[in-house]
Amino acid sequence: MMMKKIFTLALAAVLAGTALASCAAKGFDKDGAITVISREKGSGTRSAFIELFGVEVDDEDKTVETADITDKTNVMMTSVSQNANAIGYISLGSLNDSVKALKIDGAAATVENIENGSYKISRPFNIATKSDLSETAKDFVDFILSDEGQKVVEDNGYIPVASTGAYSGSKPSGKISIGGSSSV
């Protein structure tokens, strides 16, 4: 088994609770049932949500048995945006005007509140690699951690880490395989 290195990017991809949350929201029925929407097993967003909210018991998700399950961030957002009585969760970088992020303990889901710790529901994104990277893969990681790479992170609604300076890679040609969260 090959050793893996983990580069922690404190991107703090926030799990912003999404909902049309106000009783004044158009179509909200304060006496109606709340539709809980969750992600599929194996979703990193789901894993972080159940851990952060303390609803994981003996490695099992105890959110609610009747939750509607979605398999992608955009499906979660569409499901919530089309049902005024629905609630779900996404990463901050995915948040747009179709859904509303809920306040947690009175704190809004903002980059500033995540960085100062008042919005407590956040998680880092990580880069996991094999111990021996190809020149192309190493160059890609160098780009991600550079000023230019962290600007891409920030421009996409996530929280950048301290960069390693300007990108000065060799720009090799080659192929790398990337997999992981649909939140990124």
Where in this protein do the model-derived segments appear?
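C-terminal motif of bacterial Sec signal peptides marking the signal peptidase cleavage site
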Residues: 18-22
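Positively charged n-region of N-terminal signal peptides that target proteins for export
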Residues: 1-11
